[in-house]
Amino acid sequence: IDNVCIRGHVGQMSLKAHGIDLSREHVKLNDAMLSDADIIVELSDTVPPDTTPSENFWKINLDRLKLRNSALAVHMPGDTLSVKTIFTNALATQAYFDLYKGLYTVRHIDWDGGGLRYDQNYEPAVRGFDYNHLLLAALSIKADSFYYCNSRIDLKVRQAMFREKSGLVVDSLRGRFMMDSLKLALPDLKFSTPGSQVRMKMAMDLNAFDDIRPGILETEVHGAIGRQDLMLFIGNALPRALARTWPRYPLVVNGKMRGNLQKMHLSGLTLKLPKTFSMTADGFVANLTSPERLRSDLNLYATAHSLKFILPLLPRDVTNVIRIPDGIAFKGRVHVYGSRYGSRFVATQGGGTVRG
């Protein structure tokens, strides 16, 4: 195989075939088993390709494939990306491979115990949940179908659970995963952790975060995110004092977003932290990565039930003379253009009203 180096060892491998048709280039495998194997696949872009004409028309039907205590690692060219999977006990049934078309399908997957490691090797590691360096343990996946052809993946996950090195524990994950060379789609994803329950839909162009002519990210989210999970994802972006005093209630999130970092539209986006605050926003935010060029036009309704958790952010001489009352409400339209802010609003607290 051009540009591929495969090495490692296999403890035990067995195949049972009751139908090999050489004339039709077709193999019927009843059972296959791989045990105590450690295989490394290294892809290289420096090896000249084999230009000898050859075509592989073989097709393989596989009834059952068992993997036990085995590992498979893949290293991309230049070792920019590496992925390692560990199978404690896995079973795949009703598989079909067409080597000429590059078509691979599996009817059922039952992966019970193992792990997965994903590393963007030239990206620095960060605290919390690190998208570039994932390490999943106690991994269990039950899938009803898997399809791969022409860089298109379609996977239907019936049930999955795992632990991530950051501390994230996923008790249940269900949904469909679709991806090709241009787009990623999660049409109906549901997942829960000990402190969170979320249902979401997402469709994203893979160039959605490009600087020039970016694609579109579209997502709809409904659920509640527990404090521990929230801090894994945004804790590093918050001031330490605020992260310490953040209330221990789940953050309720509902709404839709569509756009990219150049311009993001919000539709019915609602954030609610019980006994603390609630906020609903519609409109857009633009130039998200350039604070000096930030623009927004938002219809905003917010109620602050209690803002005591932000007091550590204020200087002591301020908190000694100023008290932030409970029950502040704000309704208005907010404009931001760089360092300039403007709003037409009504703010109320108790029996008082301020208009601007």
Give each language-model segment a name:
Residues 1-356:
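N-terminal targeting/secretion presequences
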